[in-house]
Amino acid sequence: MRMLPTNQIWRYWSFETFLEDVSALGVRDVDLWLCNNHVNIDAHGAYNTDEVVRGMRRHGLRAMTLTPEQGNPKAYNVASEDGEIRRLTLCYYRQIVRLAAALGAERISLNSGWFPFDADRDRAWDAMVSMLGKICRAAAEEGLTVALETLVDKPYRLVTSLETLGAALLDVGESNLTVTIDTGTVARNGEDIDAYLSRFGSELGYVHLTNLSRDIFAHLAWGDQLGGLDPQDLLRRFACAGYAGDAALEMTKPSYFERPRDVLSRALTTLRGCEC
Protein backbone atom coordinates (compact mmCIF):
# COMPACT_ATOMS: atom_id res chain seq x y z
CA MET A 1 0.00 0.00 0.00
CA ARG A 2 1.36 3.41 -0.98
CA MET A 3 0.92 6.07 1.72
CA LEU A 4 -0.03 9.55 0.52
CA PRO A 5 0.40 12.33 3.08
CA THR A 6 -1.90 15.31 2.67
CA ASN A 7 -1.25 19.00 3.23
CA GLN A 8 -4.22 19.45 5.57
CA ILE A 9 -2.19 20.06 8.72
CA TRP A 10 0.07 22.48 6.82
CA ARG A 11 -2.90 24.84 6.33
CA TYR A 12 -1.15 27.54 8.40
CA TRP A 13 2.14 27.10 6.55
CA SER A 14 3.21 27.95 3.03
CA PHE A 15 2.91 25.43 0.23
CA GLU A 16 6.69 25.53 -0.14
CA THR A 17 7.16 24.44 3.48
CA PHE A 18 4.80 21.51 2.92
CA LEU A 19 6.80 20.47 -0.14
CA GLU A 20 10.11 20.79 1.71
CA ASP A 21 8.88 18.87 4.74
CA VAL A 22 7.36 15.88 2.96
CA SER A 23 10.26 15.51 0.53
CA ALA A 24 12.72 15.64 3.45
CA LEU A 25 10.85 12.70 4.98
CA GLY A 26 11.35 10.62 1.85
CA VAL A 27 7.81 11.05 0.53
CA ARG A 28 7.30 11.09 -3.23
CA ASP A 29 3.52 10.87 -3.65
CA VAL A 30 0.86 12.99 -1.96
CA ASP A 31 -2.86 13.66 -1.77
CA LEU A 32 -3.19 17.37 -2.51
CA TRP A 33 -5.93 19.09 -0.51
CA LEU A 34 -7.12 22.14 -2.40
CA CYS A 35 -7.06 24.77 0.32
CA ASN A 36 -6.66 28.20 -1.23
CA ASN A 37 -3.60 28.95 0.86
CA HIS A 38 -1.80 26.33 -1.25
CA VAL A 39 -3.84 25.91 -4.44
CA ASN A 40 -5.72 29.03 -5.49
CA ILE A 41 -8.71 27.50 -7.26
CA ASP A 42 -12.40 28.27 -7.55
CA ALA A 43 -15.23 27.85 -10.05
CA HIS A 44 -13.64 30.32 -12.46
CA GLY A 45 -10.02 29.26 -12.58
CA ALA A 46 -6.98 27.61 -11.04
CA TYR A 47 -4.87 30.69 -10.67
CA ASN A 48 -1.51 29.31 -9.53
CA THR A 49 -1.44 26.07 -11.52
CA ASP A 50 2.00 26.75 -13.00
CA GLU A 51 3.44 27.56 -9.57
CA VAL A 52 1.98 24.39 -8.05
CA VAL A 53 3.24 22.21 -10.91
CA ARG A 54 6.73 23.72 -10.74
CA GLY A 55 6.90 23.32 -6.97
CA MET A 56 5.89 19.68 -7.12
CA ARG A 57 8.42 18.93 -9.83
CA ARG A 58 11.19 20.86 -8.09
CA HIS A 59 10.83 18.64 -5.02
CA GLY A 60 10.33 15.42 -6.97
CA LEU A 61 6.74 15.02 -5.77
CA ARG A 62 3.63 13.71 -7.49
CA ALA A 63 0.03 14.54 -6.64
CA MET A 64 -1.76 11.23 -7.10
CA THR A 65 -5.06 12.51 -5.68
CA LEU A 66 -6.78 15.89 -5.54
CA THR A 67 -9.13 16.45 -2.61
CA PRO A 68 -11.42 19.48 -3.03
CA GLU A 69 -12.67 21.67 -0.24
CA GLN A 70 -16.16 20.33 0.28
CA GLY A 71 -18.91 20.23 2.85
CA ASN A 72 -20.64 22.93 4.87
CA PRO A 73 -19.70 25.83 4.96
CA LYS A 74 -17.65 25.52 1.76
CA ALA A 75 -19.01 27.23 -1.32
CA TYR A 76 -19.56 24.15 -3.47
CA ASN A 77 -21.97 21.32 -2.64
CA VAL A 78 -22.72 18.34 -4.87
CA ALA A 79 -26.08 17.76 -3.14
CA SER A 80 -27.41 21.30 -3.48
CA GLU A 81 -30.75 21.85 -5.20
CA ASP A 82 -30.00 25.53 -5.83
CA GLY A 83 -29.44 26.11 -9.54
CA GLU A 84 -26.68 28.69 -9.17
CA ILE A 85 -24.80 26.66 -6.57
CA ARG A 86 -25.03 23.64 -8.85
CA ARG A 87 -23.67 25.62 -11.79
CA LEU A 88 -20.74 26.90 -9.76
CA THR A 89 -20.11 23.48 -8.22
CA LEU A 90 -19.81 21.85 -11.62
CA CYS A 91 -17.53 24.66 -12.83
CA TYR A 92 -15.35 24.15 -9.74
CA TYR A 93 -14.96 20.45 -10.43
CA ARG A 94 -14.16 21.11 -14.07
CA GLN A 95 -11.32 23.34 -12.89
CA ILE A 96 -10.15 20.51 -10.63
CA VAL A 97 -10.16 18.09 -13.57
CA ARG A 98 -7.97 20.51 -15.54
CA LEU A 99 -5.60 20.89 -12.60
CA ALA A 100 -5.44 17.11 -12.17
CA ALA A 101 -4.49 16.74 -15.82
CA ALA A 102 -1.72 19.34 -15.44
CA LEU A 103 -0.36 17.53 -12.37
CA GLY A 104 -0.70 14.01 -13.77
CA ALA A 105 -3.01 12.98 -10.94
CA GLU A 106 -4.98 9.73 -11.03
CA ARG A 107 -8.13 10.55 -9.07
CA ILE A 108 -10.37 13.07 -7.38
CA SER A 109 -11.53 12.25 -3.84
CA LEU A 110 -15.13 13.27 -3.10
CA ASN A 111 -17.85 13.05 -0.53
CA SER A 112 -21.60 13.21 -1.04
CA GLY A 113 -22.22 16.76 0.13
CA TRP A 114 -24.92 17.88 2.53
CA PHE A 115 -28.45 19.23 2.67
CA PRO A 116 -30.40 21.40 5.14
CA PHE A 117 -32.21 19.73 8.02
CA ASP A 118 -35.46 21.22 6.75
CA ALA A 119 -35.02 19.93 3.18
CA ASP A 120 -36.19 16.68 1.61
CA ARG A 121 -33.58 13.90 1.64
CA ASP A 122 -34.84 12.24 -1.54
CA ARG A 123 -34.52 15.48 -3.49
CA ALA A 124 -31.01 16.02 -2.11
CA TRP A 125 -30.11 12.44 -3.05
CA ASP A 126 -31.28 12.97 -6.62
CA ALA A 127 -29.32 16.22 -6.84
CA MET A 128 -26.21 14.44 -5.53
CA VAL A 129 -26.55 11.56 -8.00
CA SER A 130 -26.97 13.94 -10.92
CA MET A 131 -23.96 16.06 -9.96
CA LEU A 132 -21.71 13.08 -9.26
CA GLY A 133 -22.56 11.74 -12.69
CA LYS A 134 -21.56 15.03 -14.32
CA ILE A 135 -18.31 15.16 -12.36
CA CYS A 136 -17.50 11.55 -13.26
CA ARG A 137 -18.06 12.21 -16.95
CA ALA A 138 -15.85 15.31 -16.83
CA ALA A 139 -13.15 13.33 -15.01
CA ALA A 140 -13.35 10.49 -17.53
CA GLU A 141 -12.36 12.90 -20.29
CA GLU A 142 -8.92 13.12 -18.64
CA GLY A 143 -8.72 9.46 -17.62
CA LEU A 144 -9.40 10.19 -13.95
CA THR A 145 -11.31 8.13 -11.43
CA VAL A 146 -13.59 9.63 -8.80
CA ALA A 147 -13.41 8.06 -5.34
CA LEU A 148 -16.44 8.48 -3.06
CA GLU A 149 -16.23 8.15 0.72
CA THR A 150 -18.78 7.76 3.48
CA LEU A 151 -19.26 10.48 6.07
CA VAL A 152 -20.63 10.40 9.60
CA ASP A 153 -24.41 10.24 9.65
CA LYS A 154 -24.87 13.47 11.58
CA PRO A 155 -25.04 16.01 10.06
CA TYR A 156 -24.51 14.66 6.52
CA ARG A 157 -27.26 11.98 6.18
CA LEU A 158 -26.61 11.00 2.55
CA VAL A 159 -23.72 8.58 1.91
CA THR A 160 -22.92 7.50 5.47
CA SER A 161 -22.90 3.69 5.42
CA LEU A 162 -22.00 0.63 3.40
CA GLU A 163 -25.56 0.40 2.09
CA THR A 164 -25.90 4.05 1.06
CA LEU A 165 -22.46 3.98 -0.55
CA GLY A 166 -23.49 0.97 -2.61
CA ALA A 167 -26.74 2.71 -3.56
CA ALA A 168 -24.85 5.81 -4.70
CA LEU A 169 -22.55 3.79 -6.96
CA LEU A 170 -25.54 2.01 -8.46
CA ASP A 171 -27.58 5.17 -8.99
CA VAL A 172 -24.72 7.17 -10.51
CA GLY A 173 -23.77 4.26 -12.74
CA GLU A 174 -20.45 5.61 -14.03
CA SER A 175 -17.59 3.14 -14.48
CA ASN A 176 -14.95 5.54 -13.13
CA LEU A 177 -16.77 6.07 -9.82
CA THR A 178 -15.01 4.03 -7.13
CA VAL A 179 -15.18 3.54 -3.38
CA THR A 180 -13.03 5.14 -0.71
CA ILE A 181 -12.84 3.34 2.63
CA ASP A 182 -12.10 5.81 5.43
CA THR A 183 -11.02 3.60 8.31
CA GLY A 184 -11.74 6.11 11.07
CA THR A 185 -15.16 7.03 9.72
CA VAL A 186 -16.16 3.39 9.23
CA ALA A 187 -15.21 2.68 12.85
CA ARG A 188 -16.93 5.82 14.15
CA ASN A 189 -20.11 4.77 12.37
CA GLY A 190 -19.97 1.35 14.04
CA GLU A 191 -19.35 -0.56 10.81
CA ASP A 192 -16.79 -3.20 9.88
CA ILE A 193 -13.90 -2.79 7.45
CA ASP A 194 -14.15 -6.41 6.33
CA ALA A 195 -17.77 -5.87 5.30
CA TYR A 196 -16.68 -3.03 3.02
CA LEU A 197 -13.84 -5.09 1.58
CA SER A 198 -16.16 -8.01 0.92
CA ARG A 199 -18.93 -5.87 -0.58
CA PHE A 200 -16.93 -3.66 -2.92
CA GLY A 201 -13.89 -5.69 -3.97
CA SER A 202 -12.76 -4.38 -7.36
CA GLU A 203 -14.77 -1.17 -6.83
CA LEU A 204 -12.38 -0.14 -4.04
CA GLY A 205 -10.30 2.65 -5.54
CA TYR A 206 -8.87 4.50 -2.55
CA VAL A 207 -8.33 4.38 1.20
CA HIS A 208 -8.23 7.08 3.85
CA LEU A 209 -6.05 5.38 6.45
CA THR A 210 -7.26 7.39 9.42
CA ASN A 211 -7.10 6.88 13.17
CA LEU A 212 -9.70 8.06 15.67
CA SER A 213 -10.66 8.71 19.24
CA ARG A 214 -14.40 8.59 19.87
CA ASP A 215 -13.98 11.60 22.16
CA ILE A 216 -12.39 13.81 19.47
CA PHE A 217 -14.12 14.69 16.22
CA ALA A 218 -11.02 14.68 14.02
CA HIS A 219 -8.79 12.32 12.08
CA LEU A 220 -5.94 11.39 14.41
CA ALA A 221 -2.40 10.63 13.31
CA TRP A 222 -0.85 7.20 13.63
CA GLY A 223 1.36 7.29 16.69
CA ASP A 224 -0.99 9.61 18.58
CA GLN A 225 -1.56 7.88 21.92
CA LEU A 226 -5.21 8.97 21.92
CA GLY A 227 -5.92 6.96 18.77
CA GLY A 228 -7.89 3.77 19.22
CA LEU A 229 -7.31 1.84 15.99
CA ASP A 230 -4.65 -0.81 15.40
CA PRO A 231 -2.70 0.08 12.25
CA GLN A 232 -1.10 -3.35 11.91
CA ASP A 233 -4.50 -5.03 12.00
CA LEU A 234 -5.90 -2.63 9.40
CA LEU A 235 -2.96 -3.10 7.05
CA ARG A 236 -3.32 -6.87 7.40
CA ARG A 237 -7.01 -6.69 6.51
CA PHE A 238 -6.35 -4.67 3.38
CA ALA A 239 -3.50 -6.98 2.36
CA CYS A 240 -5.66 -10.07 2.84
CA ALA A 241 -8.31 -8.47 0.63
CA GLY A 242 -5.69 -7.91 -2.07
CA TYR A 243 -5.69 -4.12 -1.88
CA ALA A 244 -2.30 -2.69 -2.83
CA GLY A 245 -3.37 0.79 -3.93
CA ASP A 246 -3.06 4.25 -2.44
CA ALA A 247 -3.95 5.34 1.09
CA ALA A 248 -4.23 8.97 2.14
CA LEU A 249 -2.91 9.88 5.58
CA GLU A 250 -5.56 12.43 6.50
CA MET A 251 -4.86 14.09 9.86
CA THR A 252 -7.02 16.98 11.02
CA LYS A 253 -6.58 17.40 14.78
CA PRO A 254 -5.92 21.13 15.38
CA SER A 255 -3.04 20.50 17.80
CA TYR A 256 -1.07 19.11 14.85
CA PHE A 257 -1.05 22.42 12.98
CA GLU A 258 1.99 23.92 14.70
CA ARG A 259 4.31 20.92 14.13
CA PRO A 260 3.02 19.12 11.03
CA ARG A 261 6.36 17.67 9.98
CA ASP A 262 6.87 16.01 13.36
CA VAL A 263 3.32 14.60 13.27
CA LEU A 264 3.82 13.13 9.80
CA SER A 265 7.24 11.74 10.69
CA ARG A 266 5.79 9.93 13.69
CA ALA A 267 2.90 8.59 11.62
CA LEU A 268 5.19 7.26 8.90
CA THR A 269 7.49 5.65 11.46
CA THR A 270 4.49 3.99 13.14
CA LEU A 271 3.16 2.62 9.86
CA ARG A 272 6.54 1.42 8.63
CA GLY A 273 6.88 -0.52 11.86
CA CYS A 274 3.69 -2.38 10.96
CA GLU A 275 4.82 -3.56 7.55
CA CYS A 276 5.26 -7.28 7.13
Residues of each region from the PLM?
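Histidine-acidic metal/acid-base catalytic patches
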Residues: 1-7, 12-26, 53, 57, ...
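Active-site-proximal loop/turn and secondary-structure-junction residues that shape catalytic pockets
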Residues: 9-11, 34-36, 69-72, 112-116, ...
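Short beta-strand segments at enzyme active-site cores
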Residues: 32, 63-68, 105-112, 146-149, ...
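Glycine-rich, proline-tolerant flexible connector loops at the mouths of alpha/beta enzymes
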Residues: 33-55, 112, 116
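Glycine-/proline-rich flexible loop or hinge segments
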Residues: 33-39, 77-81, 250-252
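Flexible, glycine- and charge-enriched loops at secondary-structure boundaries
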Residues: 42-49, 82-86, 118-125, 158, ...
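Short hydrophobic interaction/assembly module
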Residues: 52-75
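Active-site acidic/histidine proton-transfer and metal-coordination neighborhood
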Residues: 58, 75-178, 188
